[in-house]
């Protein structure tokens, strides 16, 4: 038995035939010490509702419950994993809700319900992680329904999330994250911690919404960053032609010979406001 009184994860995986599926972007994290570290990074779980995407056999799910999460809502697309998750639910009566379905189609705010303290904590499937994050960063209304996000990504994606102007990693994702949130890399996780081991290092990122971000319409900022970084090697007067080009830059007071990676979040907001 493991420290939580449940069978070791390797036994659970073998018993239920849960080999990871590449098509679903699965890499199972088996080390309960690491999953508990993720849960502790999220912090303040005692009165929280936690939304978890892609729990798989439930390693992180177990850690969240061990660390005191009042309620965990686990969204799992892989039907093979449901039985393993139901065993965890039986061990923690009334605290784990399993949602069998596609996270890309989920209404996360509705799943959270009227809970005051909502946290998103997940070892996100690699093939949908970035798309989900952008959705969580760009709702029309702000502050969002969640208090924080503690998410695992490939290291390269994590670096893009926290990147600052002038960095080779700085791009659309860094602007969207920097606009409305404070994001930091909490720690790295080596490939050997997973089964099967991925080819890259993973990183856990802690993201906390800003209470009062700069005001701009979401769609305008999205179009501006998409155009600017779609041709990041070109000067802004060329890359931004589709959204206003020289006239837009002049209204925003930004030199058209600059490149996208040199602009601060505040400057991107200025541009977007003028579209």
Curated annotation (Swiss-Prot):
<comment type="function">
    <text>Specifically dimethylates two adjacent adenosines (A1518 and A1519) in the loop of a conserved hairpin near the 3'-end of 16S rRNA in the 30S particle. May play a critical role in biogenesis of 30S subunits.</text>
</comment>
<dbReference type="GO" id="GO:0052908">
    <property type="term" value="F:16S rRNA (adenine(1518)-N(6)/adenine(1519)-N(6))-dimethyltransferase activity"/>
</dbReference>
<keyword id="KW-0694">RNA-binding</keyword>
<keyword id="KW-0698">rRNA processing</keyword>
<dbReference type="InterPro" id="IPR029063">
    <property type="entry name" value="SAM-dependent_MTases_sf"/>
</dbReference>
<dbReference type="InterPro" id="IPR001737">
    <property type="entry name" value="KsgA/Erm"/>
</dbReference>
<keyword id="KW-0963">Cytoplasm</keyword>
<protein>
    <recommendedName>
        <fullName>Ribosomal RNA small subunit methyltransferase A</fullName>
        <ecNumber>2.1.1.182</ecNumber>
    </recommendedName>
</protein>
<dbReference type="GO" id="GO:0005829">
    <property type="term" value="C:cytosol"/>
</dbReference>
<dbReference type="GO" id="GO:0003723">
    <property type="term" value="F:RNA binding"/>
</dbReference>
<feature type="binding site">
    <location>
        <position position="54"/>
    </location>
    <ligand>
        <name>S-adenosyl-L-methionine</name>
    </ligand>
</feature>
<dbReference type="InterPro" id="IPR020598">
    <property type="entry name" value="rRNA_Ade_methylase_Trfase_N"/>
</dbReference>
<feature type="binding site">
    <location>
        <position position="27"/>
    </location>
    <ligand>
        <name>S-adenosyl-L-methionine</name>
    </ligand>
</feature>
<feature type="binding site">
    <location>
        <position position="76"/>
    </location>
    <ligand>
        <name>S-adenosyl-L-methionine</name>
    </ligand>
</feature>
<dbReference type="InterPro" id="IPR023165">
    <property type="entry name" value="rRNA_Ade_diMease-like_C"/>
</dbReference>
<keyword id="KW-0949">S-adenosyl-L-methionine</keyword>
<dbReference type="Pfam" id="PF00398">
    <property type="entry name" value="RrnaAD"/>
</dbReference>
<keyword id="KW-0808">Transferase</keyword>
<feature type="binding site">
    <location>
        <position position="29"/>
    </location>
    <ligand>
        <name>S-adenosyl-L-methionine</name>
    </ligand>
</feature>
<dbReference type="InterPro" id="IPR011530">
    <property type="entry name" value="rRNA_adenine_dimethylase"/>
</dbReference>
<keyword id="KW-0489">Methyltransferase</keyword>
<feature type="binding site">
    <location>
        <position position="123"/>
    </location>
    <ligand>
        <name>S-adenosyl-L-methionine</name>
    </ligand>
</feature>
<feature type="binding site">
    <location>
        <position position="102"/>
    </location>
    <ligand>
        <name>S-adenosyl-L-methionine</name>
    </ligand>
</feature>
<dbReference type="InterPro" id="IPR020596">
    <property type="entry name" value="rRNA_Ade_Mease_Trfase_CS"/>
</dbReference>
<comment type="similarity">
    <text>Belongs to the class I-like SAM-binding methyltransferase superfamily. rRNA adenine N(6)-methyltransferase family. RsmA subfamily.</text>
</comment>
């Amino acid at each position: 038995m493991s420290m939580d009184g449940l069978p070791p994860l390797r036994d659970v995986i073998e018993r239920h035939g849960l080999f990871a599926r590449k098509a679903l972007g699965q890499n199972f994290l088996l080390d309960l010490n690491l999953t508990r570290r993720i849960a502790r990074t999220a912090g303040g779980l005692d009165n929280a509702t936690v939304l978890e995407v892609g729990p798989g056999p439930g390693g992180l799910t177990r850690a969240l419950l061990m660390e005191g999460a009042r309620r965990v809502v686990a969204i799992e697309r892989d039907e093979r994993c449901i039985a393993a998750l139901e065993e965890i639910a039986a061990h923690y009566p009334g605290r784990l809700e399993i949602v069998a379905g596609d996270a890309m189609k989920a209404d996360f705010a509705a799943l959270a319900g009227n809970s005051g303290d909502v946290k998103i904590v997940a070892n996100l499937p690699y093939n949908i992680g970035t798309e989900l994050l952008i959705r969580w960063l760009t709702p029309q209304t702000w502050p969002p329904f969640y208090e924080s996000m503690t998410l695992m990504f490939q290291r390269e994606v994590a670096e893009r999330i926290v990147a600052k102007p002038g960095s080779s990693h700085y791009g659309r994702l860094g602007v969207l994250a920097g606009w409305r949130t404070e994001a930091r890399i909490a720690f790295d996780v080596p490939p050997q911690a997973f089964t099967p081991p991925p080819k890259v290092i993973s990183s856990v990122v802690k993201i906390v919404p800003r209470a009062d971000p700069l005001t701009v319409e979401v769609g305008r900022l999205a179009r501006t960053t998409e155009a600017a970084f779609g041709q990041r090697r070109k000067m802004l007067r060329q890359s931004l032609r589709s959204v206003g080009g020289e006239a837009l830059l002049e209204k925003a007071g930004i030199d058209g010979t600059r490149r996208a990676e040199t602009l601060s979040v505040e400057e991107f907001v200025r541009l977007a406001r003028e579209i």
